[in-house]
Amino acid sequence: MGSKTPNDHRRGPNVESSPHAAIDTINPPKHAAASGLLHGPLEGETEDGEDEDDDKTGADLKSVGQLNNSTKKKNKRKKNKKKKKTLLGGLQTTPPRVALSSIFYNQRYPEAEIVGYTTNNDNLQRITAEEFRHLCVVNDMDDEFLNDYRKAAEVHRQVRQYVQTITKPGIAMSQLAQEIEDGVRALTDHQGIETGDALKAGMAFPTGLCLNNIGAHWTPNPGAKEVILQYDDVLKVDFGVHVNGRIVDSAYTMAFNPVYDDLLTAVKAATNTGLKEAGIDARIDCISEAIQEVMESYEVELNRKIIPVKAVRNITGHNILRYKIHGDKQVPFVKTHTNQRMEEGDIFAIETFGSTGKAYLDDDIGIYGYFCDEHASAAGLHHSSAKSLLKTIKDNFGTLVFSRRYLERLGVKSYHLGMRSLVSKGIVQSYAPLVDVPGSYVAQFEHTVLLRPNCKEVISRGDDY
């Protein structure tokens, strides 16, 4: 989910950063028994713990035949040992609707793409502010951190791989959104109907389904005119999955007319460049410059005209915090000037947008979604409808982005007046669709990457992209 750059935003170093989610080390230390150190009896002892010398005094050794018989019995006992239970307990259905907890018996989910850092992290002297941030990261760390992320990523992969098979000209955008969101809720085993259930796991933000010159932040809304996918459309699919607030944000673009292939190739290559350059202590301005260089080395031929692919200037990649899709760091797709660096423990959504238009996105009419500003004061609220709506939002979404569809799914009615009051007071912020000039085409690819101490894990990587 792209982070729009404010009009008055100056790209530069941040004075301070918020705490970031922590990450586990790659190979945690094993217990002695698990590592095989306590596999058998100590030297000089029998398996019963008795000293061998006590048994040998004044006694003859057992015959060779007796020893052989004993060995055979032991071998038989070894063969009868029960096999370990496999990790997978069953297969996924089509469409995917079986909760992952029913497939992965031990609740451990697969690793994604592990990439070693190209240079050793030899910067051992840290400034005080960075040490403080690192302590905040450690305090936020728990044993389930990495497993939560891997579960969310596995849900994303399974859902999107099915959705890609049904995404064809003639399908309605509302049907695609429902398939994605129903799949996510089924696989996380959290339907989000009971109060607070959506905060445990589920959708991290509304499904983005943006066509052609619509760059980002469009989703079907109740009562709106149905939009049908056409053969000549360029469709961007952007959705997020969270488990306990650990958000995986990933997006891809589909086109059926091969004339758009070079556009998609350019944006995918630019995103992979950003992932390659990302790492601990990586300078964000260097990453941005590399992304733009790759993106704008491509051209696309449309209507017998050669059009350069341009990197969109006013939307960026971003770091991700717990229960917050947009953190305090941005990764532009164009050359910029900043001293900001990536840090150990950061989680980034590395995404790029390429356009055949002016490569600048403006707000369009309509509303994509909302999010609640946790720091805004509700002291000035007087309407009971606004107060009731705010409680519903906090109880069910917290700081996660939500849409009108999500409110109506909870059975909330007549919320428009209350929502206008919350938005006018600055308690709730709204997202508008972002568009390039009519007649242009925008493509997007995105992955979430975890900057672990000794490697980076592209957590959302799959066989598809």
From Swiss-Prot:
Biased composition (Basic residues) is annotated at 71-86
CDD domains per the UniProt record, alphabetical: MetAP2 (cd01088)
Q: How is the cofactor bound?
A: Binds 2 divalent metal cations per subunit. Has a high-affinity and a low affinity metal-binding site. The true nature of the physiological cofactor is under debate. The enzyme is active with cobalt, zinc, manganese or divalent iron ions. Most likely, methionine aminopeptidases function as mononuclear Fe(2+)-metalloproteases under physiological conditions, and the catalytically relevant metal-binding site has been assigned to the histidine-containing high-affinity site.
Which residues make up the binding site for a divalent metal cation 2?
Answer: 249, 318, 351, 446
Q: Where is this region: Disordered?
A: 1-92
GO BP, sorted A to Z: proteolysis
Give one Pfam family.
Answer: Peptidase_M24
Biased composition, class Acidic residues, residue ranges: 44-55
Q: Does the keyword Mitochondrion apply?
A: no
Q: Which domain of life is it from?
A: Eukaryota
GO MF annotations for this entry?
initiator methionyl aminopeptidase activity; metal ion binding; metalloaminopeptidase activity
Q: Which positions are annotated as binding substrate?
A: 217, 326
List the InterPro entries: Creatinase/aminopeptidase-like, Met_Aminopeptidase_Type2, Pept_M24, Pept_M24_MAP, Pept_M24A_MAP2, Pept_M24A_MAP2_BS, WH-like_DNA-bd_sf, WH_DNA-bd_sf
| EC id | 3.4.11.18
**Keyword vocabulary terms for this entry:** Aminopeptidase, Cytoplasm, Hydrolase, Metal-binding, Protease
Q: Name one GO cellular component term.
A: cytoplasm
Name the catalysed reactions. Answer: Release of N-terminal amino acids, preferentially methionine, from peptides and arylamides
Give the subcellular location: Cytoplasm
Q: What does this protein do?
A: Cotranslationally removes the N-terminal methionine from nascent proteins. The N-terminal methionine is often cleaved when the second residue in the primary sequence is small and uncharged (Met-Ala-, Cys, Gly, Pro, Ser, Thr, or Val).
Similarity comment text for this entry: Belongs to the peptidase M24A family. Methionine aminopeptidase eukaryotic type 2 subfamily.
Q: What is this protein called?
A: Methionine aminopeptidase 2-2
